[in-house]
Amino acid sequence: MSLITIFAFFIKATLVLSLDILTPTTLTGDQTFNEDVSVVSSLTLNDGSQYLFNNLLQIAPSSASVTANALAAVSVFTFSLPPSSSLSNSGTLIISNSNTGPSTEQHIVITPNVMANTGTITLSLAHTNTDSSSTLIIDPVTFYNTGTINYESIGSETNDPSLTGNILSIGSSGRTLQNLGTINLNAANSYYLLGTITENSGSINVQKGFLYVNALDFIGNTINLSTTTALAFISPVSQVVRVRGVFFGNIIASVGSSGTFSYNTQTGILTVTTNGVYSYDIGCGYNPALMSGQQETLSFQGNLYDTFLVLVNQPIPSDLTCAAVSSSITPSSSVEPSSSVEPSSSVEPSSSVEPSSSVEPSSSVEPSSSVEPSSSVEPSSSVEPSSSVEPSSSVEPSSSVEPSSSVEPSSSVEPSSSVEPSSSVEPSSSVEPSSSVEPSSSVEPSSSVEPSSPAVPSSSAEPSSSVVPPITPIPSSSVVSASVFDTSSTLPSSPTVPTSSVSPSSPTVPTSSVSPSSPTVPTSSESPSTLSTPSSSAAPSSFCPTCVSSGTPPAPSSSAVVPTSSAGGGNGGDNGQPGADGQPGAAGQPGAAGQPGAAGQPGAAGQPGAAGQPGAAGQPGAAGQPGAAGQPGAAGQPGAAGQPGAGSGGGSEQPTPGAGAGSGSADGNQSGTSSGTGNGQAGSGQAGSGQVGSGQAGAGQAGSGQAGAGQAGSGQAGAGQAGLDNTASGQSEGGQASAMDGDQSGRGGQSNSGSLLQPNAQQGTGSGTGSDTGADQASGESPGQIGDAQPGSGTDQSSGRHSLAAEARTSQSHSLAADARTRSTTRQTSVIAPGTAPGTAVVTTFHGCGTVNHKGMINILLALALLVLL
């Protein structure tokens, strides 16, 4: 359907009552539109399971949009534009469904009568389980796309073991897809492109998965592959399919069996031959050695096909552009005689035939060898030296030049074609006017004469090139080209030397011989190595780059035509002098026939081309720079020196004097006894607390724990007073404890005289003993300081024992291993708690020790108190 038909349809559709969306509008739930919908602003459809547009959906201008969002968690979602509808989109159409699950289905069916998209259509869909339960189709009757069609994925479905889910099918058999825009495929494992694809600027980008193409024609569009994507053609098309992005991991599949492939590095065409022939333009620059092919089985629409795969195992070349191939001679470039053949004798201008191109010894046809600038024969088209006329063809003596043997119109010059002159030289002495050179022989496309380079006849030779030469016979009839030869443009330099001489009365000017400037048009197309088999003589068999149009014979050549026939009285060869006319004999006898001229010398062999200069040697790569040496790590800092520990010795404790406990009794002559016992207090030796220095061994000094000196208590004897009928209590002296044994016997107390009431009382005697045993033990441990890297050791042990007999000594040592701890026993004065009855044992708690019982001391105090009272 033409664009006029499309526009007419939409104009007609606008006459129908329509729903116009002029402001942003949101509709919720399922929607069915039986009227035309024209969206000028935006239309959003939310939370529906189906959206149906049964008539025209028009989205314009480019800022307008329609967004259809599927209801969350819905199992079946449908968006439909049926055949009764039409779609005209200049803005944006988005269809979105993110639901997944084993039972999830989606039916996106866009099959309107006409779909004209100049904007953007996006299918944003999650992956559903199979295409048998879901339907994704874009297949309008008329498909016209100059915009963008996106198919993208927004979710993943794992319940698809056969990888057949979400297959989007675009087009159908018998319909045409006019795609001037872009189609992006990036959501599924497979896509189908069906029908006939046309237009010259469209592109189909396969960004994920496998694109299957089943088309009758594929015109103008480019298929762009991406990483690990593939392309399959189910049947061959007559066009060359343009494919880009072919590299590692890509596959190009062509249905058919017994497949083979070839790659033309000059044209970039990959040709696959199976039951049919597939041609893919993948670009130049690939290495055929890095391509591989294999036969596989392909599944398409439920059917299995034998398929040939081509894998490209190389990156994309940096430049895919192919060099201009000018060596093809197109069929339209017909070669017409344009160079006049001018014999040395008078040849009428009408019989001049101009060659349109010359053949180089290197078998290349160069544009410079043409007489007229218009006949530009490309230099790359070559007729190889092997396609030369075999030297066995010779001019028969009896043959006359008959131009009637025309160059066949069917003869074409291919790079492989050989020159086959069909004209035979016959002995008639005239060039028959009926002979014509037909210029209709076209040069085939394989020899690089471009269509624009037909040789235009520069003489009076008609298109039928009928040569009617009223040529005056000239003995030295050499064919001389009027065109100036360029020595660089090598021409067939060995014109056929006519060996058949004609009598002076009717010499034949060999105008039908192939001159250096008039190449014979070949009648067959052969490979470059095929030798031409001339049907007659007058064909050059060698090429001479040094020959010019002077009519002089060429230098000897190994490939020159060697004359094999001769005739008497004829013209000599190029170098031979014509024989003298016979003298009339007597009685009118003809003179002797002239001797034939010496045979022309073969042309000089072509000089070999200069040897190619060797390529410049590759420069060595710059030497790698050594890596920078690693910097040594910073030296560790030594630890700060530790301070020596200050060890202090245990302190000394002076024991308190022991209180003497004495008792006295007086009974007449009875003697009193007194004894006292003093408990010395233990000195508390404090251990020095040595601090551990960091890294320095301290000299730990032992603390000197002094033992407290235990003083013996002085036990006073109670003074016994004599009373009536009572013996006075003698008071004992306070005996001092001996410094040696700590035990002293008190001197007997002096009794007082008897009282008046007891005049007869006798003097009492008293004795007192006092003992004091001091016990003091202190222990302490202290760690010495680490100093001067010498480990110090020290322990602190203070012990002391005091007695009247000896003085305690203190020892102390320090240890580095542990802090010294000091245990001290401190003896404090007993304090009797208020209200304590005499004789009661008082328990006093001391710091750092247990409890001490002082019952004996109480007894002594009671005795002293009694004496005071008395």
Swiss-Prot record:
Please name every pair of cysteines joined by a disulfide bond in this record: 284-322
Task: Give yes or no: UniProt keyword Disulfide bond.
Answer: yes
Q: Which residues are glycosylated?
A: 224, 669
- BP GO annotations: cell adhesion; extracellular matrix organization
Name any GO cellular component annotation.
fungal-type cell wall
Task: Indicate, by first and last residue, each region the UniProt record lists as having compositional bias (Gly residues).
Answer: 567-576, 642-652, 675-721
Q: Which InterPro entries match?
A: Collagen_superfamily (IPR050149), Trimer_LpxA-like_sf (IPR011004)
Q: Which residue stretches does the UniProt record annotate as biased composition, category Polar residues?
A: 724-735, 792-801
SUPFAM superfamilies named among the record's database cross-references: Trimeric LpxA-like enzymes
**Source domain of life:** Eukaryota
Per UniProt, subcellular location reads as: Secreted, Cell wall
**Signal peptide start and end residues:** 1-18
Chain intervals for the UniProt region annotation (Disordered): 329-835
UniProt GO molecular function: cell adhesion mediator activity; extracellular matrix structural constituent conferring tensile strength
Give the Low complexity compositional bias ranges.
331-566, 577-641
The record, for Gene3D superfamilies, names: Hexapeptide repeat proteins
Q: What is this protein called?
A: Adhesin AWP1
